[in-house]
């Protein structure tokens, strides 16, 4: 395996960081009552990939009840938790970006930390379309203190593709959203010897031309990839297969390190192809059984396998 080249500011053993991101597919139960959100909230909180992280980034926390259940279940392991993007405005240290316009749901992103959160901010993207345009899409920024060492984490969920034939518009919106992330980092004036991590469902297919543009635009090194070769897999994931049986599997979820700040000696993204205990839902007299935590697989990142 060829490791990515990381420049100066190598992290020492006592400043290692392990982050996991997971798009949990908590759609609002009022609109989508048959996706086992409450069952999956309990299953996810007990899943092996949840254990032993420093930071968790969650996407698609659109349903209030299952989100509250998940966060409550994880409170003992991850006591420091941001609100969901777009909610509880008085609990954020700062709010940036586009705050006007009618939105029908929150932004779905929350960060949970084993270590104290020193600062938490939310930013709303200026552009979005389709269902994303009706949500308070943006990113969550936290500064955490791990045993005296500061780390900066941005969790986000970029514009999704609309329809089966991309027209380029969604990629253009993702590009503007990445530019907002870069501008935010620039304006924060974060010390160069402190690590900055960007993670979440970025909706960019690994290996595509957009992927290589993303690495450049976000100013991040390409990580080493281990684990499953897709994070949204219609051939192995029962939920993804049910929803989109004709679409090809895709690698969409990442945890990346900003080049301009402290670097680990190596950085792995590990996609976990994990099955959950069986859970069932009923609709119109028919019972459906699934064995997946979500339609996306979680991704963990660290500087050690």
Residue ranges and their predicted role:
Residues 187-197, 203-305:
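Metal-dependent phosphoester-hydrolase catalytic domains
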């Amino acid at each position: 395996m060829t490791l990515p080249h990381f420049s100066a500011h190598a992290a020492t053993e006592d400043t290692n960081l392990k982050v996991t991101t997971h798009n949990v597919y908590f759609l609002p139960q009022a609109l989508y009552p048959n996706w086992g959100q409450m069952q999956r909230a309990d299953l996810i909180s007990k899943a092996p990939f949840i254990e032993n992280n420093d930071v968790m980034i969650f996407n698609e926390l659109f349903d209030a009840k299952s989100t509250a259940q998940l966060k409550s279940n994880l409170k003992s392991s991850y006591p420091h938790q941001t609100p969901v993007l777009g909610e509880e405005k008085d609990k954020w240290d700062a709010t940036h970006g586009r705050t006007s316009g009618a939105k029908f749901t929150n932004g779905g992103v929350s960060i949970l930390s084993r270590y104290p959160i020193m600062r938490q901010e939310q930013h709303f993207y200026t552009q979005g379309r389709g269902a994303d345009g009706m949500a308070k899409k943006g990113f969550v920024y936290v500064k955490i203190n791990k045993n005296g060492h500061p780390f900066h984490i941005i969790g986000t969920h970029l514009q999704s593709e609309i329809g089966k034939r991309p027209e380029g518009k969604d990629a253009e919106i993702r590009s503007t959203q990445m530019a907002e992330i870069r501008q935010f980092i620039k304006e924060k004036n974060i010390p160069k010897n402190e690590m900055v991590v960007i993670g979440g469902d970025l909706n960019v297919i690994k290996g595509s031309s957009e992927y290589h543009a993303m690495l450049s635009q976000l100013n991040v090194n390409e990580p080493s990839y281990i684990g499953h070769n897709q994070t949204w897999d219609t051939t192995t994931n029962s939920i993804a297969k049910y929803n989109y049986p004709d679409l090809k599997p895709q690698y969409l979820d990442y945890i990346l390190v900003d080049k301009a700040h402290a670097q680990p000696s190596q950085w792995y993204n590990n996609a976990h192809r994990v099955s959950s205990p069986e859970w069932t839902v009923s609709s119109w007299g028919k019972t459906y059984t699934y064995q997946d935590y979500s339609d996306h697989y979680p991704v963990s990142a660290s500087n050690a396998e």
